[in-house]
Amino acid sequence: MTTQRYFILAKCYNKRGKLLSTAFNSYERTHPVQKYFATRVGLEDKQYLHAEIAAILKARTKKIYRISVERYGKDGQPMLAKPCLICQEAIKAYGIQVVEYTK
C-alpha cells in the first residue's frame, strides 16, 4: 500500500496583508514544535512537518494575523486543504485570527 502525497503550501500574513512567510509540507523532515502539537492532540504518528507549522515557524516572532493553506493533487487541481487537528491546535496557540484554505 502506498501513501498518497499532496503538494501543500501555507502562507502567513500580518494584519495589513503583508506576506511574512511561505512553506511547504515535508514528508522527510520534522521539528520539535510539530512533535509537541501532534502529541498534544494525540496524533504522535503524524510527525512529518506540516506546511502550516513550517510557515508559522518561518514567520518567527512576527505577528501572524492570517494563514492561507493550499493543497493540490498530482494533476494540479486544487483540493480541500482544511488544516488538520494538529495544525488547528498550533494556529490557535499562536493566536492566528483568520484561516483560509482551498476547497
PLM ranges: what are they?
Residues 1-103:
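Zinc-dependent deaminase catalytic domain
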